[in-house]
UniProtKB/Swiss-Prot annotation:
Residue positions binding substrate: Y28, H164, G165, A166, H167
Reactions this protein catalyses: A + NADPH + H(+) = AH2 + NADP(+)
Originating species: Bacillus cereus (strain B4264)
GO molecular function: FMN binding; NADP binding; NADPH dehydrogenase activity
Free-text function comment from the UniProt entry: Catalyzes the reduction of the double bond of an array of alpha,beta-unsaturated aldehydes and ketones. It also reduces the nitro group of nitroester and nitroaromatic compounds. It could have a role in detoxification processes.
Name used for this protein in its record: NADPH dehydrogenase
This enzyme's EC code(s): 1.6.99.1
Single GO biological process annotation from the record: response to toxic substance
A Pfam family it matches: Oxidored_FMN
HAMAP family xrefs: NamA
Subunit relationships: Homotetramer.
Length: 345
């Protein structure tokens, strides 16, 4: 049986063997608290590649040490971190998948002993520290850090990079009027609030020629915040700058109640795709092959990002293939165990 989920997908100069993406998920497992890769990361990502994921995306990786969520985050702020990341891409490639990395800065959500930085001195909630409002020099240094991180990503062998512009982290904080109260050229109008991301994309384009994704929070879930329609305009600007795909998540900009249900964020991928004609990724409580296949067949998204389901079962692609009646070729090492995987779901 033919399956769109298991059909190849080419984006720019990279061809994925299927449409399944391992969504970036922080593991907080840099054992030396120096941003370095550990054996856990090699096993964690290599296993999902062996499980037949098309694109394995490494978790949010900090472009500056002070931009980590925690001191156990992965980092890419120094050349000495390239070696471990290169081992990771080698594990991924050797097991048949393409490798991506999410470049990130936590902004006001950095939970370190040092200062947190943000576009404006507004804490996420009353339990978190008041961040330092970034001055122009700090903004420029952070933009340069993203560029250097992109170059290190190339040296480490990644095929795709994703800029983390979602979930209330630094880029998202500049985009949203809830967190950006600046009165200079980086605040105020949508064009000014987009300027930080615009300059990051421009700087990354100078050193990176592969596909670039951007993860967005397409809904602030706040009456004064951004909606998916605001992100239509942001996406049009990103598309003009050469961004290849928008990874459509939502929320976490400010504390808010979110009604979650299977596929609750697919609507955002569909809306962005329809109104901008850019490729999109759907993410959020997508847990079955039939659900993923329907999203693709309905032209609501181009790639399917799977998170927690891949934590529960690194061989999710095999289960999805069984469900869809698609014959997935297992790694040759596992050919002595043909047939269906049985689950208790």
């Amino acid at each position: 049986m033919n399956s769109k989920l298991f059909s190849p997908y080419t984006i720019k100069n990279v061809t994925l063997k299927n449409r399944i993406v391992m969504s970036p998920m922080c593991m907080y497992s840099s054992g030396n608290e120096d941003g370095s890769v550990t054996n856990f990361h090699l096993i964690h990502y290599g296993t999902r590649a062996a499980g037949q994921v098309g694109l394995v995306m490494v978790e949010a990786t900090a472009v500056l040490a002070e931009g980590r969520i925690s001191n156990k985050d992965l980092g890419i702020w120094d050349d000495n971190l390239i070696e471990g990341l290169h081992k990771t891409t080698t594990f991924i490639h050797d097991n048949g998948a393409k490798a991506a990395i999410q470049l990130a800065h936590a902004g006001r959500k950095a939970e370190l002993d040092t200062n947190a930085f943000a576009p404006s001195a507004i804490p996420f909630n009353d339990k978190m520290k008041i961040p330092v409002e970034m001055n122009i020099q700090q903004i420029k240094e952070t933009i340069l850090a993203f560029q250097r991180a992109a170059l290190r990503s190339k040296q480490a062998g990644f095929d795709v990079i994703e800029l983390h512009g979602a979930h209330g982290y630094l880029i998202n904080e500049f985009l949203s009027p809830l967190t950006n109260k600046r009165t200079d050229k980086y605040g105020g109008s949508p064009e000014n609030r987009y300027r930080f991301l615009r300059e990051i994309i421009d700087s990354v384009n100078e050193v990176w020629d592969g596909p670039i994704f951007v993860r967005i929070s397409a809904n602030d879930y706040h009456p004064d915040g951004l909606t998916v329609q605001d992100y239509v305009q942001y996406t049009k600007w990103m598309k003009e700058q050469g961004i290849d795909l928008i990874d459509c998540s939502s929320g976490a900009v400010v504390p808010a109640h979110i009604d979650v249900y299977p596929g609750y964020q697919v609507q955002y991928a569909k809306h962005i795709k329809e109104h901008t004609k850019i490729a999109t990724g759907a993410v959020g409580l997508i847990t079955t092959g039939s659900q993923a296949e329907q999203i693709l067949n309905n032209n609501e998204a181009d790639l399917i990002f799977i998170g927690r389901e891949l934590l529960r079962n690194p061989y999710f692609p095999r289960i999805a293939a069984n469900e869809l009646g698609f014959e997935l070729q297992e790694p040759y090492q596992y050919k002595r165990a043909p047939g269906k995987i049985h689950t208790n779901k």
